[in-house]
UniProtKB/Swiss-Prot annotation:
Family membership noted in the UniProt record: Belongs to the NGF-beta family.
Ranges for region Disordered: 62-86
Source organism, top-level taxon: Eukaryota
SUPFAM superfamilies (UniProt xref): Cystine-knot cytokines
Gene3D superfamilies, per the entry: Cystine-knot cytokines
InterPro entries, sorted: Cystine-knot_cytokine, Nerve_growth_factor-like, Nerve_growth_factor-rel, Nerve_growth_factor_CS, Neurotrophin-3, NTF3_N
Ranges of compositional bias, category Basic and acidic residues: 67-79
GO terms (BP aspect): cell surface receptor protein tyrosine kinase signaling pathway; modulation of chemical synaptic transmission; negative regulation of neuron apoptotic process; nerve development; nerve growth factor signaling pathway; neuron projection morphogenesis
Entry function: Seems to promote the survival of visceral and proprioceptive sensory neurons.
Protein name, as recorded: Neurotrophin-3
Amino acid sequence: MSILFYVIFLAYLRGIQGNNMDQRSLPEDSLNSLIIKLIQADILKNKLSKQMVDLKENYQSTLPKAEAPREPEQGEPAKSEFQPVTAMDTELLRQQRRYSSPRVLLSDSTPLEPPPLYLMEDYVGSPVAANRTSRRKRYAEHKSHRGEYSLCDSESLWVTDKSSAIDIRGHQVTVLGEIKSGNSPVKQYFYETRCKEARPVKNGCRGIDDKHWNSQCKTSQTYVRALTSENNKLVGWRWIRIDTSCVCALSRKIGRT
């Protein structure tokens, strides 16, 4: 296409020169030489362009081909959001802010006090924190109104040796005890609340009419996020059940209205 354009342009230029009687026409050899040079330049340009394309294709062919994402076949488990145990890193620990619960603590030392949200509970602490715990108990008793009693007696404590739990799917999972993070490993601690006894009084819960009702104190559970592994393979944050309160369960006695 470029060669044809050059020929047409030169023919047009020569026609203009022929009409101009005041100027001498170019010699025939000079015009032919100009046409040959233009054709050679165009051929060289096309040749260089083709060489550049070949080089680009050869370079791309040497690069490793990226594999397209493979769809899981029928019966094959989908990709899990949990990581293998060998691949666990600090990213899981960074997610604690998003999954944090006041009842779950990651620390390199055993906690001596209850979480700030649960200072008013009957905390069972270690002897080191006995004085501070007793002060908080006196403060809680001072704030309560005289003559008020709980239906059930409960106690709260930091569980330091939790090894297994039931997750939200009903599967038993392993609770990670020690987690390697940098130079100092951290452990998981769970602040749990449970009933001291099923029957604080002879016939059941305190203050319940035992003529018409059967009553019993039962420990209630709720879900919190914790670092766990399933089948000792996949590590991640899962919802697990822990003891969080003590409630009074009632049932009407048969034959009573």
